[in-house]
Amino acid sequence: MKKILCLGLVLGCVAGFVMGCAGKDLPGDLEKDTIIEECHNIIEMVNDRDFQGVVNLFRDDLKEQLTADALGQALNQPLDQLGDFVKYKTESVAAAKEDNTDKDMAAAVIGVEYSEGSISYVISFDTDMKVIGLYLK
């Protein structure tokens, strides 16, 4: 039986988000391929346990609230349980709004297969391509 991991990093004003319709245009100049490429970059950093590199990609106000140590403490155990990266399984990107501010954003859900299980990364970006949310489920 597959274990279901649910890990939420609640970051300041990003308490959550509401996914928009998948057919809705992405905000600003954001492009689906660019978002997916950046998600792959982030997931590779997570897999390499380069948590400072991940934190550096967050929006400035969120960097003040998140440390590489805290991110590592949250992610090391799930990563240990999942084993080695195998492949990306699914990728989707949708327009969304930040709950607390109603600002435009984009959210990507990337399904990833590991040697001991699978997990979905939910990564959200503001219109400047700064990370504003990182969730594993």
Task: Please provide the spans of the model-predicted regions.
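Sec-dependent bacterial lipoprotein signal peptides
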Residues: M1-M19
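Exposed beta-sheet edge and beta->alpha loop/turn motif
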Residues: S92-K137
